[in-house]
């Protein structure tokens, strides 16, 4: 692993000073402090072993974050089961996490291990803005996803027609613009230690107005919106479940689950797979009588044809539905007089059967889509919950410091721990998708092991 080399590079940079010269050189300033004296030795706060250990842990976290989120992007863009327009939100969210791992975390690690900012004044402002931007974009993405879930639950048909890839992409652009507006202030008002400080530091604006406004805009307000939206989704889902259970009624005497009004078993709405109908439930009595009349005519025509051909098959068929279908196919193929007599009725039955199969297939697809939406909503609820758990300690302690300053300030090691726990969230979303979503799990396996299978075949 490259952690010893990284630790050595950090130690060399600390000894060399910022920007490759004296430790005191910063922006337009010189290589000494205001009094003209040298800065002295770098303020190293970790031993060489601790530097190597922390670099190894954070390096693994960075690699894991990048690889996991790249897999998410590839899975959504290549898997047929994940190609729904709303999954573009996950692509954008994964992209934000990749940018956190590549553009923010390495510099945060260097700043932590070296105990001062080595990379100059301009990059300090850019780094702070990117840090706030990517964190804010993550939670604004989750907020937009929660609204998407709410509309897909409460306005399923209308909203699904409107939710095109173009609309989703426009929403994603709006999410990034909102995040940029919230994160722009660090570019123009980042905080810098006074000249009397030992080494240059890079930190966010320390004024109370900025601390509170950034915490509210970047975390607390989106969290409130997500909480209210998901509470509403839960209420709607609970009401629908109660209504469906009342319509279905109790289970049959044999303990079997009741069949829905479209002839599909209950499993179709729960696990996303269409179960074959246990019984044929007709929409109304008149259409059922009409079908029985057609089947009777078909059987009579089939018997006449069988008598003409000398067939001695059994009169007991496998069931009215199957007998009708088989009779229709046989009659349509038969050139005999019995086939001609029953051709009109066989065509009508074949038309009815094909229409019923299409209707059943349509209902099946709708049930599968609803089950997928349900699972997707649950997975995203887990993603949002984990995000809040990871970032709440940092934002709460940071806003508390903005209100009452030193009286409420946490010990510095604990505050830094909360800070890095927030960064860890960027690596958790792929794990959540793998654990809770079968489509992602299957797609990840296909991506990771496809080449290995090809190698074995060759």
Curated annotation (Swiss-Prot):
Entry-linked SUPFAM superfamilies: Family A G protein-coupled receptor-like (SSF81321)
Pfam families documented for this protein: 7tm_1
Basic residues bias locations: 291-303
Membrane topology, from the record: Multi-pass membrane protein
Keywords of the record: Cell membrane, Disulfide bond, G-protein coupled receptor, Glycoprotein, Membrane, Receptor, Transducer, Transmembrane, Transmembrane helix
Disulfide bonds: 124-202
Chief location: membrane
CDD domains hit by this protein: 7tmA_alpha2C_AR (cd15323)
Site (described: Implicated in catechol agonist binding and receptor activation): 214, 218
InterPro entries given in the database record: ADR_fam, ADRA2C_rcpt, GPCR_Rhodpsn, GPCR_Rhodpsn_7TM
Cellular compartments annotated: Cell membrane
Any one of the GO CC terms: cytoplasm
Protein name stated in the entry: Alpha-2C adrenergic receptor
Organism from which the protein derives: Rattus norvegicus (Rat)
